[in-house]
Amino acid sequence: MYETPLTGLVLSGGGARAAYQVGVLRAIARLRRERLGPRRARLKSPFGIIVGTSAGAINAAALACHADRFDASVEVLSRVWQDFRAEQVYRADSLGVIRSGAQWLTMLSVGWLIARWRKARPRSLLDNGPLAELLNTMVPLERLPMMLQQRQLHALAVTASSYTGGEHVTFSWEVPAGTAA
């Protein structure tokens, strides 16, 4: 059991909401600096438990992976959302659209005949490789176990939904059992 109560942060989905969330987080960071002083406020996140869904899950995971540097993580999120463009999510250039279109056309015209195409069919209309690159930069998941082990963070949960199947899946991480306080 924890001696002091934990504060949780729940971040909902939606791109516009995720950008709004970062504005609120910036205000929280500013208020902490005013109250605690700039040196102490830059440290550990005020949120011991962070939960997010969809675009809010991206913000949640980024905050969790940098739970030891709250101000810095908020600034990273702020820079991403202030300059956010469609090109950061999918390739909309001519070559990217042609390549993706060719994959779909091949799969739809003859792919059903070839077993390898049935298994390796395109997953999206446009190439979302840029989003994967952005997430790898924003969310260094290799830091998450350390944040939990050091108790910079007590738990993270992110929820994802399938557009095609409609199912929801929640992934969660928490402080390992038996970890000293």
Positions of PLM-derived features:
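Patatin-like phospholipase
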Residues: 2-8, 16-129, 133-135, 172-181
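Residue-level detector of functional hotspots within protein domains
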Residues: 10, 36, 43, 142-144, ...
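Short polar catalytic/cofactor-binding loops
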Residues: 12-16, 164
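Glycine-rich, flexible loop/turn motifs
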Residues: 104, 121-122, 140, 165-167
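Surface cap/lid and interfacial helix-loop subdomains adjacent to catalytic sites
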Residues: 124-155
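Active-site gating loop/helix substructures
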Residues: 132, 149-181
